[in-house]
C-alpha cells in the first residue's frame, strides 16, 4: 500500500532559496544568476514587490542609482525585467514555516502550504518580516472573511453590481475605492477622520468622485457588522452624532499591514529589535548558510535603503556560492565581459 508520504512530490532542489519578493529579493535573484547560482523565491504576499507594492506603489523613489525618479511599481517592473534572463520561479502566498539543516549541510525548508525545498543556502530578504493585513477587531467578521469581508481586492469583477464599503484612509483604501466605483453598484469610503494618509492626488480624485456623485464618503468608525443568514446586510458606524446603519454587501477593510517575523523568530538566529544580526563581511547570520539582507538585516549603522540591500545581497550570494559549490572556485567576471550573461540578456530582451 502506498502511504500519503510516498505520494508527496520530491523537494524542490535549488542552490539558494530567497525569502521575499521585494526589490532586494528580486535583485538577489538576478545577481544569483549572474554568478552561476540557481534560485527560487517565496513570498507570503499575493503579488511581487513586497512592501513597495503593498504600501506605496505609486509614490516616487529618488535614491536608486542612475534612475532620477521612478515609482515603486516601476522599480519592481524593471527588476522583474532584469532577472528575466534567469527566469527564477516565484512562489507567492507561501510563508516559510520551518528550516532544518541536514547531515550534508543543506537545508530543508517548508512553507505553510506544503512546498518543500532542498537548498544549499537561505537568503532572507523579507523586509520587516511577513506582512499580514490589520484585521477588524470584530468577532462577527471572522466567518465572513473572503466571502463578504475582505482585506484585499484580488479581482474587481467579484464586486460587480454590489454595494461595497471600503474602510481606511491610506493609499490602498482610496485607490481601491476609486477603482471599485467603476464596477460596483455603489461604493462608500469610510474613514475615522476627514484627513487622509494617502497621496494628495488620490485624495483629490476621491473628493472629485464624491462631488460627482460617483461614490460616497463618511467619517466614522466601524462598530459592528449585521448579518442575515450567512450574508452581510449592513454595517454599524460610530461617529460624533452617535451610531447609524450603512447598507453593505461587501466590506473591504484596508487598514494597512502589520509586520511580523513570524516563524523566522524561532529559527535559532541572533535577533535584536525584530531584525537578524549579520556579519557585514558577507551578511551571514549566526547560523552559517542563512543570510539576511535588506530591512531585515541588523548591524551597526544600518541604513534602511533599497540600494543598501542591493549591495548586501551581492556580498551574501558570493558567500552562498561556497555552500552550493564547496569544491569549485568562483571566478569573478565583470558583467561587461560576461559573454554568457550577454547572450541571456539578448535572448530575453
Curated annotation (Swiss-Prot):
It catalyses: 2 reduced [2Fe-2S]-[ferredoxin] + NADP(+) + H(+) = 2 oxidized [2Fe-2S]-[ferredoxin] + NADPH. Binds 1 FAD per subunit. Keywords: FAD, Flavoprotein, NADP, Oxidoreductase. FAD binds at residues 43, 51, 56, 96, 131, 295, 336. One of its GO terms (molecular function) is NADP binding. SUPFAM superfamilies: FAD/NAD(P)-binding domain. It comes from the Bacteria. It holds the Pfam family Pyr_redox_2. It is an enzyme of class 1 (oxidoreductase). Homodimer. Belongs to the ferredoxin--NADP reductase type 2 family. This is Ferredoxin--NADP reductase. It comes from Paraburkholderia phytofirmans (strain DSM 17436 / LMG 22146 / PsJN).
Amino acid at each position: 500500500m502506498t502511504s500519503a508520504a510516498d505520494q508527496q512530490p520530491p523537494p524542490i532542489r535549488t542552490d539558494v532559496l530567497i525569502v521575499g519578493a521585494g526589490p532586494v529579493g528580486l535583485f538577489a535573484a538576478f545577481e544569483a544568476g549572474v554568478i552561476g547560482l540557481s534560485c527560487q523565491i517565496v513570498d507570503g504576499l499575493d503579488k511581487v514587490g513586497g512592501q513597495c507594492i503593498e504600501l506605496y506603489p505609486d509614490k516616487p523613489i529618488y535614491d536608486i542609482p542612475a534612475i532620477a525618479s521612478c515609482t515603486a511599481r516601476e522599480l519592481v517592473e524593471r527588476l522583474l525585467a532584469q532577472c528575466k534572463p534567469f527566469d527564477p520561479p516565484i512562489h507567492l502566498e507561501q510563508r516559510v514555516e520551518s528550516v532544518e539543516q541536514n547531515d550534508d549541510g543543506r537545508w530543508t525548508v517548508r512553507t505553510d502550504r506544503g512546498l518543500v525545498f532542498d537548498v544549499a543556502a537561505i537568503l532572507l530578504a523579507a523586509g520587516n518580516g511577513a506582512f499580514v493585513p490589520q484585521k477588524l477587531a470584530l468577532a462577527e467578521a471572522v466567518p465572513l472573511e473572503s466571502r463578504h469581508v475582505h482585506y484585499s481586492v484580488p479581482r474587481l469583477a467579484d464586486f460587480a453590481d454590489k454595494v461595497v464599503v471600503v474602510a481606511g484612509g491610506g493609499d490602498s483604501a482610496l485607490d481601491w475605492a476609486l477603482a471599485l466605483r467603476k464596477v460596483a453598484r455603489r461604493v462608500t469610503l469610510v474613514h475615522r477622520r476627514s484627513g487622509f494618509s494617502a497621496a494628495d492626488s488620490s485624495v483629490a480624485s476621491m473628493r472629485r468622485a464624491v462631488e460627482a456623485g460617483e461614490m460616497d464618503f463618511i467619517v466614522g468608525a466601524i462598530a459592528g457588522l449585521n448579518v442575515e443568514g450567512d450574508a452581510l446586510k449592513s454595517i454599524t458606524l460610530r461617529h460624533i452624532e452617535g451610531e447609524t446603519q450603512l447598507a453593505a454587501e461587501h466590506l473591504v477593510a484596508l487598514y494597512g499591514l502589520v509586520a511580523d517575523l513570524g516563524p523566522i523568530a524561532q529559527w535559532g538566529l541572533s535577533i535584536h529589535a525584530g531584525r537578524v544580526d549579520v556579519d557585514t563581511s558577507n551578511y551571514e547570520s549566526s547560523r552559517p548558510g542563512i543570510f539576511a539582507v535588506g530591512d531585515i538585516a541588523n548591524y551597526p549603522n544600518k541604513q534602511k535603503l533599497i540600494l543598501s540591500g542591493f549591495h548586501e545581497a551581492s556580498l551574501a550570494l558570493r558567500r552562498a556560492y561556497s555552500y552550493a559549490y564547496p569544491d569549485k572556485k568562483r571566478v569573478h567576471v565583470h558583467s561587461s565581459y560576461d559573454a554568457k550573461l550577454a547572450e541571456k540578456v539578448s535572448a530575453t530582451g
